[in-house]
Each structure stands twice: as C-alpha cells, then as structure tokens.
Amino acid sequence: MAAYDLEEQEQIANAKAFWQQYGNLITGAVVVAAVGVGGYFGWQGYQNRQAAEASAIYGVLTQAAEAKDSAKVKAAAGELVEKYSGTGYAPMGALVAGKMLFDSGDLKSARAQLTWASEHGSSELRDVARLRLAAVLLDDKAYDEALKALEPAPAEGFSARFAELKGDVLLAQGKSAEARGAYQEALAKLGAEKAGEGSSVAAQAAGPYKDLLQQKLDALGGA
C-alpha cells in the first residue's frame, strides 16, 4: 500500500475491515436467500468491496490534492489504477491527479494521468480528460499531440471548448487563419449549445464565455 499517514491508513483499513468481518456473512445470507444465483451475488459482493476500498483511497487522493502533496497524490492515483482500475474511482482519481500535477508544474506526470483517464473513464469524463490533456500538451509545446487529443468528436456540450482549445493550439503554431476559423466554430457551437439547453440560467452562464471567444476572435481581426 502507498505511504499514507496513520489517519488515512485507518480510513482505508476500516473499509477493508468491514468486508473482512461481514463480507462472508453478507454473501452467505444472499446465497441462502437466492440459491442458484450465488455466483452473481458473489460477484456483486466483490464489486461492492472494491468500490468501498477505492472510495477510501479516492478520498485520500482528493485531500492530498487539496494539500498540494504531489507524492501522496501520485501514490494514491497509482494504487487506484493498479488495484481498482475496474471502478469509476480510478479514472476520476487520474483526472484529479492530472490537474493537480499540472498546476504544480509536473507536466510529465500530468500527461500520464490524463492520458489514462482519457482512455478509461466514462464518455464525459474522457472528454474532460482530453481537454485537460490537450491544455497540458499545449503548455508543453507538443502541438501536434494536443491537436490529436482533440480530434475525436466530443459529447454534446463540449464542442465549443474543444474548438476553442484547438484555436489556441493553432495560434501557438502561428496558424492565425486556422485559429480564427476554430474560434468562429467555437462561437457557432456555443450558440447551438445554448439553443439546445433553452435555459436562461445556461444563457447567462454562457455570456462571459461568449465574450472571451469574441475577444480572441477580435484579436485576430475576425468578425
């Protein structure tokens, strides 16, 4: 297990101890009550146990991220990937770790975490991870890789952000005309997203973002 402090070790140990103490009893009761589907419930018990343990480690990771403890963040994220990759906590942990490591200047580790999250998370989580990964790659001047990370079409609601970041990468490459086109696309996508949501709250939230996109476009002499 990673090198956690005593309180964190206790949190994780408590999650494991519950299943060690009561797991057989719970599983046994289920099997007695549902003879013939014991295998299914046994698997469910295993999944529940994995989720409980992964949840405890994810809690340690988020606390470490808030404390900007890079070593502990890496250790917890690594344990989630190594032992609990089948749970939703592993990609969420990689996403949190990637952001924290990027903010701390560890671009190499951030890239590794976000790449994993972009390949193993849910659809929306993958899109968030791809956006963050592309931002890391842009900061690292890995422009072609950043554009590649943005290539697959994202889920609805992410299109404007993807187009904007594509524009940022193209601008960094000195491709002003292509960057202008990407920002124009981002504005168009944002308008479509606002129309689809049909909410005054959503429209208000999109206002400042629309202004930002327009400023980027104006800086390039676009309309």
Protein language model annotation of sequence segments:
Residues 9, 51-55, 71-74, 161:
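Amphipathic alpha-helical repeat elements characteristic of tetratricopeptide repeat
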Residues 2, 36-56:
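Transmembrane signal-anchor/signal-peptide helices with a preference for the extracytoplasmic
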Residues 84, 89, 99-223:
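Soluble extracytoplasmic domains of inner/organellar membrane proteins
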Residues 1-32:
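N-terminal positive-inside, membrane-proximal cytosolic segments immediately preceding the first
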Residues 56-92:
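Short extracytoplasmic
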